[in-house]
Amino acid sequence: RVPANLTPVRSTDPFFSEPVFTDFAQLVYARAHEMRGAGIREPLEAWMTRDAIDKLFADRADLASVSEVVFGATRVVQAATEGGFVRIDVEFESNLTEVRAGVRAQVLCSERWSFRRKAGVRSPAPERMKALGCAGCGSTLEPRTDGTCPSCGAVRRGGLTQWEVGAIPFANRRPL
């Protein structure tokens, strides 16, 4: 595979690290699927747009839980600048365990998620990226349900201070 051209990201953020971003993307992906399984949407609004959450939750019929998210591959496939934002498209291949109507099943997933952040925002230190906390003050506490930091009150939405999932253009999930 040819590595994605990350010039659009690095031109506005010289501190960008693809491995650290990939860890962050996997953390968001796993947490989002676990919350999908629990039927909990609100906390996801700190890391995902409502459209992305709607797409993620589209197949919740009879779903009781999601667990054991295992990554087979995570690839940054494209980066671009558009409308004052930097976008990174990530392809995930994973399997996870779903419980639907009392039946536990392994599910193979192939998905593309588009992460976005305001152009010019600098990457926080790796430990801040991996905490899903506040990019502003460094608090490792997760945002309140209204998207604000419990330590400093900064808003953690809209890709203004940290990456968010702006869209899920492709999601294919099937039983193994």
Predicted regions and their residues:
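Core segments of small alpha/beta cavity-forming domains
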Residues: 1-66, 136, 145-146, 150-155, ...
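N-terminal alpha-helical segment
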Residues: 25-28, 70-72, 130
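Generic secondary-structure microfeatures
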Residues: 48-51, 92-96, 119
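Surface-exposed, charged secondary-structure patches
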Residues: 63-105
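A short, surface-exposed beta-strand/turn
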Residues: 101-124
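Short, intrinsically disordered, charge-biased short linear motifs at domain edges
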Residues: 118-125, 133-140
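Short metal-coordination and nucleic-acid-contact micro-motifs, chiefly zinc-binding Cys/His arrays
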Residues: 127-131, 144-145
